[in-house]
Amino acid sequence: MTIEYIKKIHFEICKNSGITPLGEFQDKEVGITGTSWRPKLPSECDYEAELEKILKNEHELEKCIDLFCWGGRSQMFMDGNKRVANLVANKEMIRLGQGIIAVPVEKIGEYFTYLIDYYETNDNTKIKKWIYENCIDGIK
């Protein structure tokens, strides 16, 4: 898993959507519905180091949930961040035999409540627990 791979996933997900720049980090401040919190610009972040730290986690399921959460919160791209995070995390989930992360449609509102809390606090403890209890599908 690399930042370049994540960029390729973004390109594929958004290539027919009119989003620019495709497969490249956004360079403008973005707003997020439901919160006044604003992510740092990618130029202010070290995504390589952040990803490396996540990938060092020896607990496979926790690593995948961290990847999912981080990918959504980092707001690397103008659009498609949660979709990219979901696909990237699920690639690792499947590779490691951990099932997939799938937010049940009837729990989307609850998910967004936890997500906004995570965005605003940068503490993923609550959302990770909630994802583990509600969104992991296919564990043997």
Show where each model-derived region lies.
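FIC/Doc superfamily catalytic core
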Residues: 1-140
